[in-house]
């Protein structure tokens, strides 16, 4: 299934790293330096949306989350059940091929996909807290695409369950609760 992420605001799918004294956080990039959402983060977004669909909204059958995304071993259980594997494979969400071809050999266009944002923590007295200034790289709003593929054990309704979960994914990456990474997720056929 082809899935599109239409980013509506600046966003960062972080790498967990920075660049010495210049940037505290970096955007994930592909081998050509273009922004992406790693497949692992895509999976996490869908996992949380399906959890909400099943547990909070009760619009998916009980057990759907484990059926699609598998389970982990429970170290607190003296007689643990073996973990169940996931039945879906998630790829990195990248710029569409037509866009990548136009941009990849033009360093000025690649650089234009990113900006640096500054932030600081404000104390109760309305003044910036000491040593709280941060510089983070963000990507400009773009549309990314990814493939989600079923494995042999996937139930027949996996795609319809993920389509129902798509509207529940409202933001991606870091800063989601602060307005960054607002997104519309849709089936690629739309």
Predicted feature residues:
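Small/polar/charged residue-enriched interaction surfaces, especially the RNA/DNA-contacting tracks
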Residues: 1-190
């Amino acid at each position: 299934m082809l899935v599109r992420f239409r980013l509506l605001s600046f966003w960062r799918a972080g790498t967990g790293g920075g660049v010495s004294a210049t940037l505290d956080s970096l955007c994930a990039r592909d081998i050509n330096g273009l922004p992406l959402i790693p497949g692992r983060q895509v999976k996490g977004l869908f996992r949380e949306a399906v959890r909400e669909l099943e547990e909070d909204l009760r619009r998916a059958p009980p057990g759907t989350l484990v059926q699609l995304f598998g389970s982990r071993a429970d170290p607190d259980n003296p007689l643990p059940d073996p973990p169940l594997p996931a039945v879906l494979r998630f790829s990195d969400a990248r710029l569409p091929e037509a866009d990548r071809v136009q941009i990849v050999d033009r360093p000025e266009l690649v650089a234009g996909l990113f900006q640096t944002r500054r932030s600081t923590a404000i104390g109760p007295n309305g003044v910036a807290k000491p040593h709280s200034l941060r510089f983070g790289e963000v990507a400009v709003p773009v549309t990314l695409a990814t493939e989600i593929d079923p494995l042999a054990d996937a139930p027949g309704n996996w795609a319809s369950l993920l389509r129902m979960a798509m509207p529940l994914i409202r933001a991606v990456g870091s800063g989601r609760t602060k307005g960054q990474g607002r997104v519309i997720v849709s089936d690629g056929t739309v």
